[in-house]
């Protein structure tokens, strides 16, 4: 990926809790080894037919373990009943969008630039959605938890590394969009200077 630092996924998961992801320079850079990429592709094939169920489990667990995440999902903010969440069409749809993103990431896992662009774009969108970076790692942790019984420790570690890569790259995208928005608002706040010729 052209990253100067290769990091393995931390044993404690998720790795951080910085609400805004720090500065773009503070974001951990992770590279995916060839072995990790192969393990991810293989294990994705094993669960591909079960993505809808995994997406629901992931979000129900996310809201149970991190109820503050509901603040970003306004339609679920007042829903406390796990069964209501499990049967929610909106939650199922969002779970499928997340799983679709994971599928696209796996499909691009050997195409570094395309994978980076996909994830950076998602991070930029999350700035617009006002979804702070501290939540990104929670989603990966709940995905892994939902799959824990089906995976080997090697598969789990590979996915931890992938989600660390995804969350750190999303944070970079979030920070880039935050900086772009600030620069645009700075330009709009500057007084316009008109130059007129005096005769």
Which stretches of residues belong to each language-model region?
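Globin-like tetrapyrrole-binding proteins
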Residues: 2-199
């Amino acid at each position: 990926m052209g990253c100067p630092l290769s990091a393995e996924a931390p044993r404690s998961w998720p790795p951080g809790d910085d609400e805004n992801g720090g500065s773009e320079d503070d974001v951990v850079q992770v590279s995916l080894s060839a072995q990790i990429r192969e393990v991810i592709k293989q294990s994705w094939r094993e669960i591909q037919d079960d993505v809808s169920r995994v997406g629901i489990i992931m979000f129900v667990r996310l809201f149970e373990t991190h109820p503050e995440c509901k603040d970003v999902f306004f339609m679920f903010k007042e829903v406390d009943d796990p069964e209501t969440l499990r049967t929610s069409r909106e939650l199922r749809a969002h779970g499928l969008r997340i799983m679709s993103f994971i599928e696209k990431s796996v499909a691009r896992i050997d195409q570094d630039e395309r994978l980076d662009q996909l994830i950076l774009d998602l991070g930029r969108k999350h700035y617009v959605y006002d979804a702070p970076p501290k939540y990104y790692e929670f989603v990966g942790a709940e995905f892994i938890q939902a799959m824990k019984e089906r995976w080997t420790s090697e598969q789990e570690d590979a996915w931890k590394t992938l989600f660390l890569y995804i969350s750190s790259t999303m944070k970079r995208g979030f920070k880039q969009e935050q900086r772009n928005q600030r620069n645009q608002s700075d330009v709009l706040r500057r007084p316009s200077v008109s130059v007129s010729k005096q005769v």
